[in-house]
Amino acid sequence: MLKKTGIKIVIVPAAVLLVLICGTCEAYILRGPYLLDRMTRKLDGIQSMLVTQQVQFLDADENGSSQAEETLRYLFPQSFRSDARSEESQRIHVVDHGRSMTVINGKRVGGDETVFDIYKEILLFRSRERLNDRLIDSGIDMSVVAYGRFEDKIAFVIGAEKPDDPVPRLWIDKETFLPMRWLVKKKSAEADPVWVEIRYADWRRIDHAWYPMQITYLQDGEPIREIRVDSLKTNLTFPQELFDVEHLKEKYAALLPEDKAGPVSGELNEIEQSIDEFRKKYE
């Protein structure tokens, strides 16, 4: 009788301990806002940055350019400018304190950012709160975090209960707290959503901050764009007018004047066609 009772005493605490361990495993996964705080600290430490890079359009057709040279100017944490040049076209994209504008071949074509512009937002925003709001806007549930494995590295997966759940999510390296993958839904006329994945790789430390030397875009699992950094310079002084949206509006005319209606033809139509071709690479 004593032996039987002794067995029960050993088994019951073990079962209770197992329940307690399983019930508290979830608590040891760090929460989204804290992870963003750790990540932004790793990226912070400089005032400005000049980046020169090569962009490969892996999905380009035979008639279009397959690459572009691009210069980025970061004025942390609010301003950004991209100047891209291919064989046929030039594109300027500016973001300043929440306002944006795009110029293609010297003509203003609107200010909306495309999915191919957003990779820089994780690198630009140095405020946990601003980045938190931006990720929520992209569809990520910041209250949910899981563990995942990617390329033999353990990662925190913000936005998913399981790492491969078909939801927008951000992967952060568990050891370095640097972003690895950002998965978003791209706007599409198709019934099924188009998934775009942004991968950040080959991180290098420059001064007191980190920057990825390679960024790859995948659409439905297939690589469609690759960015490779040629050079980085930090803490430079940029002319403020480079980021001044109002100044740029005065400098560059709209593709079509606001008071002009009706079809376009001749030279203007050719300009519009070249703009549309270059635009497709960024939409």
Tell what function each PLM region has.
Residues V12-C22:
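Bacterial N-terminal signal peptides
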Residues A27-L35, R41-G45, R99-R169, K174, ...:
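Flexible, processing/modification-adjacent segments and terminal tails
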Residues V245-E283:
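Gram-negative outer-membrane assembly/targeting C-terminal domains
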Residues G23-K107, D141-S143:
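N-terminal mature ectodomain segment of secretory-pathway/periplasmic proteins
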Residues I29-L30, E151-E246:
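Gly/Pro-enriched, hydrophobic low-complexity segments
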Residues L2-P13:
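Bacterial N-terminal signal peptides that target proteins for export
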Residues N63-Q67, S79, I122-L123, E190-P193, ...:
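Subset-of-secretome marker
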